[in-house]
């Protein structure tokens, strides 16, 4: 009932819920309280949001969606993936003849490009996991 009262008081469009998820979680997995999510979804009439999706079990995502989750906030795993790939690649640079080739050039030597490629793959995976692909027709465009 606190959730419903909060929604009525603030007139928000989405509700971020705490069901065992941890914002900026980075190590291991957690067990989301899907029974609590289900109860919240029965009470409120707006879409729910999960902050702290890193560590959310992939096999529970469909159930979370069925229980009202319309948005998953994924940041930590994307940042870690990008950072780790850059760290790995920057260690391979021995001689820098032209710094511009290595930073932001989008050329073969650019140490940022492998990180970018890794997060594109990761984000594509999440788009499919969250069933967020092929939604353009929902917006009449």
Predicted regions, residues:
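Extended, intrinsically disordered, low-complexity segments
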Residues: 91-141
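Short beta-strand/loop segments at the ligand-binding rim of alpha/beta enzyme cores
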Residues: 42-52
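A hydrophobic, small-residue-rich beta->alpha segment in the mid-to-C-terminal subdomain
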Residues: 68-99
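Conserved short-loop catalytic and cofactor-binding motifs
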Residues: 24-28, 52, 107-114
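Alpha/beta enzyme core
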Residues: 1-44, 58-69, 74, 87-88, ...
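A near-ubiquitous, low-amplitude feature marking generic local secondary-structure context
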Residues: 23, 47, 69, 102-109
């Amino acid at each position: 009932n606190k959730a419903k009262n909060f929604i009525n008081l603030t007139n928000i469009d989405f509700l971020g819920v705490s069901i065992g998820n941890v914002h900026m979680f980075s190590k291991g997995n957690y067990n989301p309280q899907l029974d609590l999510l289900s109860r919240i979804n029965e009470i409120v009439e707006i879409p729910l949001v999960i902050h702290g999706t890193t560590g959310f079990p992939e096999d529970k995502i469909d159930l979370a969606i069925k229980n009202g989750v319309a948005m998953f906030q994924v940041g930590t795993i994307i940042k870690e993936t990008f950072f780790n790939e850059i760290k790995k690649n920057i260690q391979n640079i021995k001689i820098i003849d032209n710094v511009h080739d290595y930073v932001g050039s989008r050329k073969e030597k650019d140490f940022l490009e492998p990180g970018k490629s890794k997060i594109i793959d990761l984000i594509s995976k999440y788009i499919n996991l969250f069933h967020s692909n092929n939604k353009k027709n929902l917006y009449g465009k």
